[in-house]
Each structure stands twice: as C-alpha cells, then as structure tokens.
Amino acid sequence: MNNLTTKNALNIMSEISQSATKSCYTLLVNYLIFGAILLFCTGAKPLPDLTVPNGFGVNIHFRDEPKDLDLIADAGFKFIRMDLTWSAVERKKGVYEFDKSGYDALTKGCTKRGIRILYILDYSNRLYESDRSVLTEQGRRAFAAFAKAAAARYAGKGILWEIWNEPNIKQFWRPQPSIEHYCKLVEATAPGLKEADSTGLVVAPATSTIPFQWLNDCFNRGLLKWIDALTVHPYRPQHPETVIKDYDKLRKLINSYAPQGKKIHIISGEWGYSLINWDKSRLSEQQQAQYLARMFLMNLYQNIPVSIWYDWKDDGSNPNEREHHFGTATYDAKPKQAYLAAKTLSSTLNGYTVQKRLDLGKQSDFALMLQSGKKEAIAFWTTLQEHKVTLPIGPANATLCSLFGNKIQLSCKNEELKLPISQSPQYLLRKTE
C-alpha cells in the first residue's frame, strides 16, 4: 500500500494550482502531474469483474507469434497464461535476457491487443540447482532476484505473477514434491514481486487438480499471507459442473486460514479437456466445445474472476497423444469447434454478468440468468440427454443463439417459453424496447 493517498494527491494538486499562474501551459502541466500522482496511488490492478469475457483466457506455448495473438484476441480472450522460464532468461549468473528470450515481444504484443498476462515464474536453473526444484537458500535468493527483475521490467501492466507450476506433483518438483521448500520459495519471492510491480498480483500455488490436504498443509505454513489469489487447476474426466462441490470445499478451507480482513479469490489457472480424456475415453470436437463453454460459464457462476482454458492450440498431431489435443485450434492454428464456441460465447454475452441460477426442476439442468444494464439473457444446457424445459422469459421477442453462433428469432406471448435443452449451451437473449 502506498503512503501517498488520493486525498494527499488532491492536497498536493491544490498547492500546485495556488502557486502557479493560470496559463494554459501551467494547467496542462498540473493535469499531467495530477494524473501521474493518481496513477501512482492506484496500486495493484484488480482482478477482472465477473463480466463476459473479461476473465476468459488461454494457455500458450509461444513467445512471438503475432498471428496467434490476433486469433486469441479475435475470439474474445482477455488473458494468456505463459511460462516465464528462469533458465531461458538467466543463462549467466545475474544477467537477465528478457529481450533475447522473446518475453519483451510477447509482453508488447499482448499489451497492444488488450490482453492481460499471467506469467508463470518457473522452473529451476542449473546455475543454482541440480534438479527441477529449488531446495537451497542460494537457489531461493537467485529465483527471487530473477522474479523481481521480471516484475521490474514489466511493471505497470497489471500482470499476475504466478510462482511455479504444479509443485504438488513429481513432474514439476523433483525428486519429490516438498511443501516446506515450496512455501519457502513463495515466502522468499513474493515481497520482491510486490516491491517491483505495484500493479501486479502474486498468485500461487497453481496446483495440479485441487489437492485439499496439500493445500491445507501449505496454508498451515502461511501461504495465504504472501499471495493475493489462489490458483488451482481443476482438471477432471467428469463434466465441468462437478467442480461446484470442490469450489465450495476449497472456499471453506481458505476461510479457515485466511488472514483477518483479507479476501483470497480462487483463480482457475489451467483447465481443459483433450479429445483424449483423462479416463482414456474419446471426446468429439463438439463435446470439447461444449465443455469449454460450460467451463467458462460455471466458473462465472462460481465467482471465479479468471478462467484459463488449456490449451490455445494443439501441441502436436499424434492422434494417440493426449497432450496434442487440448487446443481450441489445431497445431497449425486452424480454429476447431472449441474456438468457435469460445468466440460465440464471448461475443453473444459480451458485457453480461451472471445474476443467478434458475430452478428448472432437475439438478442436471442448468439455466443461468445474465444481465447487462436492462438487457437480460439466459444461458442454458443439461448434463444429460436432450429434452424440453420451460424458461421464464415473459411476453417478449427474443433471439436464440446456438453454441456455434446460429441464431433464430422467437416471439413469446406468454410468461414462459418451452425449448429443447441439450449438452450444448444455448443463449436466449430477450429483446428490450
């Protein structure tokens, strides 16, 4: 928190104005000074509100692909999540090559397109550590210095600074995950990030799935004192709606450990569905698109301010490799059905916020009431087989938009409208006078 408050800024401005002449030049200078003071006072850029599509994002694996960024922006995504790899930046002790490693170009490209960034500060560095982890005091100091240098270089852009990726599994923290060493790393790194970038937010621990006992032990070691938001990766073979009970349990756990007066938001930092599901079942492109739209909608309903879909595009073309089929686009950046579903959701409900879930009589049927000013919309779908439901739209003309953007005009003369509901979300927009 800056000691210079907005009230102090107003007092300073008043003194400047009283001592200056009333020339146009002086007024302009005063205006610029006042703006700079207020900018300094604002502090961290907040998490986005729960308005479509302000918190929608995708994971990426590139540093300088302008055409990909154009497609991402065109789909309505407002965030990207990307590794800011320690070993790529610091190849010689104490020398940070952000430009040569491509991060300057990526940051500039995102900023130009109005895309916010979640940078994952990861992984280890052979200059200091022998494995994919940070276990020594020397390594922690070096990692914290690298992180602070990154925050200083890209300060002022409201970046979410994430400390490591999935430290709770052996793949990313070797030889074995260590709550003790991970929490020590966060404690060593977070203060420097906040000092170097007052507009940024520190987020962690980016866990694989939602490991409640692991999180409980981290919270017990003080993790929530050092971070601004909690990131988890709610992967599951089941449909997205099953996350509701997990978020409820996680919130209760957070509330039992959060410092008094501190609000810790949950961020869905990585979550997607490959065409080869976790239980080895196969999904069609349409099912993947359905799950994408439903994931974003469920996260909004659950007050999750940032939702990152994994992945922007396929990481390869092997038909039997799960990792090659998470994308909203193919390996050569050709849009898949998931991309069209994301673009339709973002454009159709742009500016809308979820107000409540409507009761359709079955737990498997979902209908979310959304609002944008005086405009109303209902997003509705089911987790089971197609059937008909009755929606409370009232006498009105409306537009019904499909998962992929096909629209039909409807006229309802009664209080309710009966429509087919399927596993593909549809958007019913009531026309206003």
Describe each model-derived feature in a short phrase.
Residues 28-39:
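Bacterial N-terminal signal peptides
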Residues 46-78, 83-85:
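Boundary/entry segment of secreted carbohydrate-active catalytic domains
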Residues 69, 75-95, 102-225, 235:
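Substrate-binding cleft and catalytic face of glycoside hydrolase catalytic domains
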Residues 179-293, 302:
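Noncatalytic carbohydrate-binding groove/subsite architecture in carbohydrate-active enzymes
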Residues 279-342:
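Aromatic/acidic polysaccharide-binding cleft in carbohydrate-active enzymes
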Residues 360-396, 403-404:
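Carbohydrate-binding surface patches
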Residues 411-433:
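C-terminal beta-strand-rich structural cap/linker in extracellular carbohydrate-active enzymes
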